């Protein structure tokens, strides 16, 4: 799930 948050930060 953390990966999804990483994309949202970009």
From Swiss-Prot:
Q: Which UniProt keywords apply?
A: Amidation, Neuropeptide, Secreted
Question: In Gene Ontology terms, what is a biological process of this protein?
Answer: neuropeptide signaling pathway
* GO CC annotation, single: extracellular region
Question: What is the predominant subcellular site recorded for this chain?
Answer: secreted
Q: In which tissues is it expressed?
A: Expressed in the antennal lobe (at protein level).
Its annotated compartments are:
Secreted
Is Secreted among this UniProt entry's keywords? yes
Secreted as a keyword?
yes
Kindly list the positions at which Arginine amide occurs in this protein: 10
In Swiss-Prot or TrEMBL terms, this protein is called: Tachykinin-related peptide 5
């Amino acid at each position: 799930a953390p990966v999804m948050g990483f994309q949202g930060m970009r």
